[in-house]
Amino acid sequence: MALAIALLAFSGAAPALANGKDISFEADTVSVNDEDGSMLAVGNVQMKQAGMTLTADEVRYKRVDDRAVANGNVVFVDADGAIHKSDMMVLDTEFTHIVAETLRSRYPDGSFFIADSGDIKTDSISVFDGSRFSPCDCEFENGETPIWDLRATSTRHNVETSTIIHRNVRMHILNLPILYLPYLAHP
């Protein structure tokens, strides 16, 4: 079912959900609660806006909060092609601010982040806590171990300057810690 049909039934929330930008939306079922201004999309949910795509098993939008909560097999692809996966994500209605727990991100250059939590801002600085980073273009999610990776308590990725800054970082080679640095920055 297309979002246009669901949003016609959801009338007052349509401008808030799309914020004046075109958004396409598909799901197996969509239900609207007129009392609290919420919408629930369940089953094969797919949302597209400004070159970004979100897929999930379920998305709940609350007009009062002006945010969406996606649950189950959540995959967000940003306009640059970075792929972010999690079991749950909270997004603003323009897809520019995403918060997730247990986040796995793969960037177009093949590098990846895995983090206990991530606060992604698609147009500025993203923060990954309990992070693991490697430029290795390997199938990490399928059990392949990178030759080396960096593990940090906190990592900041600045999209504008293409800079990555790690705090309390340990370099691991073949899963063995070999070097500790309180601070490390790289492109």
Regions found by a protein language model. Give the residues of each.
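Bacterial N-terminal signal peptides
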Residues: 1-12
